[in-house]
């Protein structure tokens, strides 16, 4: 269970409302986002530690969910392969920027290393209208593109069984973006 409190002076607090979010009890976040970038269609997202969230309305006192609870694609490689936890968003980004940026703690076991966790790369959050409701999506912040040094791009490559495409690039870190149409294939490896 979560509670929303308000204060005029940050010393005296008033209980405003309660909200139930199943299977999680920590690291809440509550923030507005436009749906499909439309500033006339603002919804609020109530977020919890395990990447579960509600989309709804907030009148300054009470959050009202408009649809069932969702998860931000917990097994998606775009969201740390299901290892992301306890995400929080920045609230002081200039309004003219227009983004809601989030960073998460990531559970990671790295044998032989002196650390066991890390922070995910910052992600830009957006709300999008789909056939069965409004969904939250996350994508790496555009500032990461400034870190790229060498790039390789190709289009229209047709692959068959055992085919290989070599870019001639190497390094310790690679940022790979791929769009694949499976055609008759059941799997493709990278």
Regions of interest found by a model, annotated:
Residues 12-15, 65:
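Residue-level detector of beta-propeller blades
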Residues 18-22, 79-80:
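Surface loop/turn motifs at the tips and blade-to-blade linkers of beta-strand repeat domains
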Residues 33, 44, 49-64, 71-73:
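Acidic, glycine-rich loop-and-beta core segments that form the ion-binding/anion-interacting portion
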Residues 59-74, 78-85, 91-190:
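Beta-rich accessory regions
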